[in-house]
Amino acid sequence: MRKAHKKRSIHLVCNAHLDPVWQWEWEEGAAAAISTFRTAADLCEEYPGLIFNHNEAILYQWIEDYEPSLFQRIQKLVQEKKWQIMGGWYLQPDCNMPCGESFVRQILLGRRYFREKFGVMPTTAINFDSFGHTRGLVQILAKSGYDSYLFWRPFPEDCVLEKEEFIWEGYDGSRVLATRAYGGYSSAYGWARLKTEAFMKQRPDIVCGVLLWGIGNHGGGPSRVDLENLNQLTRETEVLDIRHSTPEAYFKELKQQDLPVHKKDLNPWGVGCYTSGVKIKQTHRRLENEFYAAEKMIASAWCQGMMAYPEAQLQEALKDLATSQFHDILPGESIQEVIESSLQIMDHGLEILSRLKAKAFFSLTQGQTPARENEIPILVYNPHPFAIETDVVCEFQLADMNLSGTFTQVTAYQEGQPLPTQVEKESSNIPFDWRKRIVFNAKLAPSQMNRFDCRLEAIPQKPKPELKVKDKRIVVKSTDMEVIINAATGLIDRYRVRGVDCLSKSACHPLVMFDSEDPW
């Protein structure tokens, strides 16, 4: 029982950090989640006062799918306030690389799940294990109903803070309370008391502190040994109120303090993770772009009554995207089996989106005017809510093989006006004038289908570009760019963009550089 005269406190947040994948595949992660949650439920039912905290909707979904009886026990413990739904996100993503909307969806997936299954909405976001945190997160957190943020990385030696407890301010002035957890998110078996004592020694003047404990990385959570040791420490300590708690309870007490304001990212850590595993990163970005573009197209077609809204399929693709953003997947430092299965998950999402986008596209093309003779219509959807100017690249098939010896020239028109158009080498290597690949510059109206009519004209022969060499130089210029190629060496002597030289004199030369084999 706590003594009323104790002014200072340490909130013990029992958890069991469990990466769904990392040095193991997801099936092993699911098994570890079941084992960990079962042990935690047993101890919560046995020990009065113990509160187990855990996050990540993906883990709870595994429990719900593979051990429903345990899931029901957890629901009961949450109602009894012996089990705290912590964080409330789908999982702990990388917190630098996803776009802002993806962070919103991580939160949305988690919030909806935990509200439906447990009737709760956490107000403290947690990303203990993410390798850094963009400042842009702050306004997303604040506008999503969070008032606080608990993290661990980057370490103090990598990211120096005025104080470990602070107010984090975003670009727009939004603010959340934030704390860098002492000594990591877990404690080794039998070491929870030692970690707590070390914290007390290192922060002797702490007024309100938080300490994460419980066996972690591959799950584990609380143990009877650690619980007995911590309960004994609580009884022996006179100057501090040490109690089992939750992140929300900690931050409710912390907000009474006068804290410094931090107006920067929380970076860096593990910088190699942001250049390693390029295939994972490229596929993720493609999936991310495809999802939001397809979703906008589908919404437009649905609003116009052209198709039913495929909510279940979109949710499936969104979960594939959210999973790919996990902080041990997107940075690319998991084992090869995880990398391969993660690419498979992303390909699954891409396949769903490919089919949905095609359906939306064909729905949105309804009612188009038939093409005239010697014209090929090209339809381009702009998913953005604003007009854009871009280069459109497309291929199409002529009505038949052109075996006459002439060449089919193509010019794109928009509303009867010709556009700058270039015929390029098509993907096919069949040596006939049959497939056509063109590029044209155009302005696309927002959130709608844009039509371009490609007019076909037979000319005597395929145009041959002329290479003009002057003063032993080949010069290529546009309004923004200038490239000068040395005709004698073949090297680029100048590459200037908007008046800024982008190449030094030593550019394009091979270099021997020291590199580290450490991917972190």
Feature-to-residue mapping (PLM):
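Surface-exposed beta-strand/loop patches in extracellular or lumenal glycoproteins
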Residues: 384-410
